[in-house]
Each structure stands twice: as structure tokens, then as C-alpha cells.
């Protein structure tokens, strides 16, 4: 049932390729439509309130583009058909569990319909993350995570912020994941709140011209300041990031193979949320971190309204036992290795 809904949603979203995709220039990313004017709140600001889950984007579009696609932002018809078949095979797990009266990974990992995007990254033109600086490589090598193969665990410092159910960080939290893709926007005079289902975080974004906080005050999700432009766009600038979380997350298809993309104190995120229709938002962002990357990089995702989407509590690892279990198991494994080598 949910898969059927995803098929319908995907048909009208995901930065669709122009009509006649085979003849069109598949390297061109269309400009964001700018003529729609949403209704306003009672205090006169554009009204973005509602549910904006990104489940429909979880259809095998990777963060980074396959080098074989070059500078193409969209798939060819043949490539799209192949992706659609792959997604359909994944979705059948869901339907099989329904027919058998069981519930397992098929229900846990939500799969949407395929779309034509070759990557979420739109800049650089090759759709891939820029190279690390020398300092970025050094810091990446020092990061600790359960996603690093062969890494021992002796202390909580051997785990990343997502392992510890604290945060996926930014901009990683804004990309689709295999589950928990709920987003909801709340507004009050001078403030926008963006609730995220994953790790039940909420971003608070003042839009009242509040002065930035001192640079020495740093948070996992940084400090955001927003402003309204053109009657249909929320622009958000975020700085003051606390180093620690990875800027990319392995749970998003096509991300680096471990949560080891560092975030420095120089990182800056500039986002635009442009309402292009009563039920659509184009979400663009640019991430710049000159300490880590040799160049900024940008991504685009298309949001679709779903005010019926419900966000439930995400307990992550209830009882907070996961870290202890990892450490206990890691120490036991190493003890066995020492005994066997004697």
C-alpha cells in the first residue's frame, strides 16, 4: 500500500527530467520556479507549515553520481528502467511479508519509487564530493565509528554521534535514509522549527533578525538564522558547528563507506526552501568547509507535502545498552584472539 502511494508521488516529483528526456540535455538542472506565492500566516510570513516527509526520495538515487554518468544530472530512459526494476524488486519484500503475515526488514526499510536523478549532489558538475584537503584527510583518518571495519571499541569516544543516537549531523540529516524520513515545519512569529523524525531532533531557526551567537558557542546542528525572500523562499544560514558528527551518513545511498566526513569549526550551510506550489518545496543547499573540502558542494531535493504523515517517537537503542554491548563484545573478541595466539 505504501509502495503504491510512493509510485504516485514519484510521478510528479524528484526534479523530473524535461519532457522528451532522450532528446533533452540531461546535464542541465532546471532552474527553480519562482512565480508561485503561497498563502501567508496571520502575522504575514509565507506559510510553510505542515508535513514534508522525504520517504518518496528513498528510491536508490545516490548522494554521489556514478562516474559512468559523467556530468548527466538525469538517467536515460534505459537507465531509468533498470533502476525502476531494482526498486521494484526491493519493494516486493514488503508485499511478501504482508502476504505471509510476517514483519521484518521489508517493513523496516522503506523503499520509494525510482526517479531519474543521477545524484542528489548537483555541484560540482560531476555530482561527486570534492576532494579533501590535507587537513581533511588527516581528520577523517582520526574519526571513530562502528562503520569502520576492524576498529576496536574501548570507550564512548570510539563511536560517532549517530552510533550514540545523538544526531546524524548536518547536512547528513537532510538526506533520505532507509527509514525515519519524516519532516514537519512549524512556525510562529519570528521563528521556524523543523522537526526531523530521525533521532527526534528539531532545528530552531529564528527569522526575526536575531544577532548571531558568539563563535565559541557551538552545537551539533550549528546555529541557524533565517530570512524570507521573494514571498516564497526561506533562506537559512547555519554556522557555529560543533566538530564531531560526519557531514555525510552511510545510511544514504551513495555516501562514503563510513561516517568519516569531518566537520570543522569553519563549516557553513546555506539552504533555500522555495515553495513552488501548494504541496511542493524545492530544497537546495550549499555546504562549504574550507578546512575539510577543496571546494564547496551543493545538493537539491524536492519535497512533497503529506500532512497525514505521523511522526512517532524514535527510541534508537532503548535502554542505552548498545555502546556497552559493543565495548564488551570487542574486548571479548580481542581476549580470544590473544589466547589463540599463545
Which residues make up each language-model segment?
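Positively charged n-region of N-terminal signal peptides that target proteins for export
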Residues: 1-4
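Bacterial N-terminal signal peptides
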Residues: 6-16
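PEST-like low-complexity, intrinsically disordered acidic/proline/serine-rich tracts
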Residues: 20-342
